[in-house]
UniProtKB/Swiss-Prot annotation:
GO MF terms held by the record: RNA binding; uracil phosphoribosyltransferase activity
Species for this entry: Bacillus velezensis (strain DSM 23117 / BGSC 10A6 / LMG 26770 / FZB42)
Entry's Gene Ontology BP terms: DNA-templated transcription termination
Enzyme Commission number(s): 2.4.2.9
Entries under InterPro entries matching the protein: PRibTrfase_dom, PRTase-like, PyrR, PyrR_bifunctional
Motif interval(s): PRPP-binding: 101-113
Similarity annotation: Belongs to the purine/pyrimidine phosphoribosyltransferase family. PyrR subfamily.
Class in the EC hierarchy, top level: transferase
Stated role: Regulates transcriptional attenuation of the pyrimidine nucleotide (pyr) operon by binding in a uridine-dependent manner to specific sites on pyr mRNA. This disrupts an antiterminator hairpin in the RNA and favors formation of a downstream transcription terminator, leading to a reduced expression of downstream genes. Also displays a weak uracil phosphoribosyltransferase activity which is not physiologically significant.
Name of this chain's protein: Bifunctional protein PyrR
Length: 181
């Protein structure tokens, strides 16, 4: 794969997360009845970063949970069949019933991972609402799923791959588009 372009650098990611944190606070009139749930792997770290920013702004901690969704196939490459994401587990340290749950992921693409996450959340409890925050929306939805909070819209072709790198996992913060050779 060849790197085509860097879309967000460390500073741009920080700015996007700060803006999303402010949007969440404004939309929810504070964050008292909200729980952030990150989709493994990078969504968890983004959720934790958002919780830190919200706490800095509001002065109150935000509960952060995580959900592990594994794909039977590589959802970022060509589709080979109707295989679906598989929920491997959820670690949510609070009851989500009657809470606003904000699912956090790095890239929104087909929408299948988010749908699997929503199914898993409804199995755990009955949230009053489920919202979605993503760092990157690259389009190409296969399901009627739309993010409530978006760091950056990046129109891509299906042949391109959007890669999010976060310092907690990848030792650097960057979002880049790669082209398959």
């Amino acid at each position: 794969m060849n790197q085509k372009a860097v879309i967000l650098d460390e500073q741009a990611i920080r700015r996007a997360l700060t803006r999303i944190a402010h949007e969440m606070i404004e939309r929810n009139k504070g964050m008292n009845d909200c729980i952030l749930v990150g989709i493994k792997t990078r969504g968890i770290y983004l959720a934790k970063r958002l919780a830190e920013r919200i706490e800095q702004i509001e002065g109150n901690p935000v509960t952060v949970g995580e959900i592990d969704i594994t794909l039977y196939r590589d959802d970022l490459t060509k589709k080979t069949s109707n295989e679906e994401p598989l929920v491997k587990g959820a670690d949510i340290p609070a009851d989500i019933t009657d809470q606003k749950v904000i699912v956090v992921d790095d890239v929104l693409y087909t929408g299948r991972t988010v749908r699997a996450a929503m199914d898993a959340l409804v199995d755990v409890g009955r949230p009053s609402s489920i919202q979605l925050a993503v760092l990157v929306d690259r389009g190409h939805r296969e399901l009627p799923i739309r993010a409530d909070y978006i760091g950056k819209n990046i129109p891509t072709s299906k042949a391109e791959k959007v890669m999010v790198q976060l310092s907690e996992v990848d030792q650097t913060d960057m979002v880049a588009i790669y082209e398959n050779e």
